[in-house]
Amino acid sequence: MSRIGKKPIPLPNKVTIDIKGQHIAVKGPKGSLELDLPSEVTVNQEGETVEVQRVDDSRTARERHGLFRTLVANMIQGVSQGFEKRLNIQGVGYRAQAQGSKLTLNVGYSKPVEMTMPQGINVAVENNTQVVVSGIDKEIVGNIAAKIRGVRPPEPYKGKGIRYQDEYVRRKAGKAGKK
C-alpha cells in the first residue's frame, strides 16, 4: 500500500469538491481547478475528508495511487491558500520590473528580457531584486519560476544570476594565477 496514497486529505472550510466519474473539480475562495483521473484510481469524499483509492494492485495502479493523491491535495491547498515561489536576483545592475502580467528582467544582456505570465499567475517585484510568483496551480507556479531562473541561472564564481530564495549555490575558486 502506498504510504502517501492511503492518507486521507482533509477538506478545509469553504472548499467544495465535485466528483463526476473520473473528473474532479475543486472550488475554493481563490478559484477553481479541474483534473481528469486515470482508470486505475478512484476518489471518494467522506464528510470532511477525501480519499484516493486504487482499483487493483497492478504496477501502474500502485504508481499512480500516491501521485494522484498528491495532485488532489495540491489542488485543495491551491484553491484555499495558493502557492508562491520567491526568486532573488544578484548582480551589479541586475533588476526586475513588473507591469500587470508582464515581467521585465535586466540581467546583463544587451536588451531587457520580457516575459508574459499566463492567466491565473501573479508576479510581483519587491525592491527590484526579489520576484514573487504566485497562483493556485502548483505545477504552473513552479514552471514559471523555473523559466525565470533559466533566463540567468546563478554562476558558481561570483554568484551572479537569478536563484530561488532557499537555494544554495556552491561557489568555486577562480584561477590560481601566476606566482
UniProtKB/Swiss-Prot annotation:
Record has Transmembrane helix as a keyword: no
- GO MF terms, alphabetically ordered: rRNA binding; structural constituent of ribosome
Record PROSITE patterns: RIBOSOMAL_L6_1 (PS00525)
Report the domain of life of the source organism: Bacteria
- Keyword Ribonucleoprotein in the entry? The reply is yes
The UniProt keyword set, sorted, is: Ribonucleoprotein, Ribosomal protein, RNA-binding, rRNA-binding
Tell me which Gene Ontology terms the entry assigns under biological process.
cytoplasmic translation
Can you supply one Gene Ontology CC term for this chain's record?
A: cytosolic large ribosomal subunit
The entry describes its oligomerization and partners as: Part of the 50S ribosomal subunit.
- Record-stated family: Belongs to the universal ribosomal protein uL6 family.
Q: What is the annotated role of this protein in its UniProt record? A: This protein binds to the 23S rRNA, and is important in its secondary structure. It is located near the subunit interface in the base of the L7/L12 stalk, and near the tRNA binding site of the peptidyltransferase center.
Q: What is this protein called?
A: Large ribosomal subunit protein uL6
Q: Which organism is it from?
A: Crocosphaera subtropica (strain ATCC 51142 / BH68)
